[in-house]
Curated annotation (Swiss-Prot):
It comes from Legionella pneumophila subsp. pneumophila (strain Philadelphia 1 / ATCC 33152 / DSM 7513). The keyword Oxidoreductase applies. It comes from the Bacteria. The gene is folD. NADP(+) binds at G166, A167, S168. This is Bifunctional protein FolD.
């Protein structure tokens, strides 16, 4: 029997509609719409698409998107100068620096220059530290989006074994913290993990964020599992797939996210929700 689908498009549409009403209410009360600064350095094709999608999503819910498209040769000093201006601006509630950055710019340094209360990506060490200490405020968008998906479908991770494949700062590490916060027993696997198959086979929840296709063999999967595929890869024919072979996996597990249409839409709506949350906090 095929797996049940975890539909990120449907759930994100519901959350966007709710967020749109919240923004409208605040505007009708005489407050300005939340403002999100979206900074793109260079013209990497994937980044251009991601930024365009984020700007369109802002427009859809009534959040004001402020665009800053900078040339690839922009210096780190110039970028820091812009961030400082955005940190001080009363019109900006959230700052998003589209990653990856050009090689001559230190990503960690740039993230640390963003005010934690405007860090709507949730990457600042302060915000990650709050999550680690079980007192989160602005949380990384993809992991929180995944948790919201699981909550909607009443897929409870408490007392379950969750295995996270991938240990990046953007997904894997904060994902493990979110799962711990929700009461799961968590195993993190990465490029140095030996006997990966063993960990995959005993997972109740499997979150795959390797950035590579087919690291997880389909025959390792089990029929009771909930599989969250964070990967996104464009194939030569123009189609998109995840880290896992969906057509095979959907026949083996209990629940699975499609790619596209699973995690991606939830990441974007969570970014918008973080911007709304930041705006509310800054008005206090």
């Amino acid at each position: 029997m095929p797996a049940s689908l975890i539909d990120g498009r449907e759930i994100s549409a519901l959350r966007r509609a709710e967020l749109k009403q919240r923004v409208l209410y605040h505007v009708e009360q005489g407050q300005r719409a939340p403002g999100l600064a979206v900074v793109l350095i260079g013209n990497d094709p994937a980044s251009v698409i991601y930024v365009s999608n984020k700007r369109k999503a802002c427009e859809e819910v009534g959040i004001t998107s402020h665009s800053y498209d900078l040339p690839a040769e922009t210096t780190q000093e110039k970028l820091i100068e812009l961030i400082n201006e955005l940190n001080q601006s009363d019109k900006i509630d959230g700052i998003l620096i589209q990653l990856p950055l050009p090689k001559h710019i230190n990503e960690r340094t740039i993230i640390e220059y963003i005010k934690p209360e405007k860090d709507v990506d949730g990457f600042h060490p302060y915000n990650l530290g709050r999550l680690a200490q079980r007192n989160p405020f602005l949380r990384p968008c993809t992991p929180l989006g995944i948790m919201n998906l699981l909550h909607h479908y009443e897929l409870n991770v408490k007392r379950k074994h969750a295995v996270v494949i991938g240990a990046s700062n953007i997904v894997g590490r904060p994902m493990s913290l979110e799962l711990l916060l929700a009461g799961a027993t968590v195993t993190i696997c990465h490029k140095f993990t030996q006997q990966l198959q063993k960990f995959v086979e005993i997972a109740d929840f499997l979150i795959v964020a390797t950035g590579k296709m087919d690291v997880i063999a389909t025959d390792w999967l089990r029929e009771h599992q909930v599989v969250i595929d964070v990967g996104m890869h464009r194939l030569p024919d123009g189609s998109i797939r995840g880290d896992i072979d969906f057509k095979k996996a959907v026949e083996k597990v209990a629940w699975i996210t499609p790619v596209p249409g699973g995690v991606g839409p939830m990441t974007i709506v969570t970014l918008l929700e973080n911007t709304m949350m930041s705006a509310a906090r800054l008005r206090e």
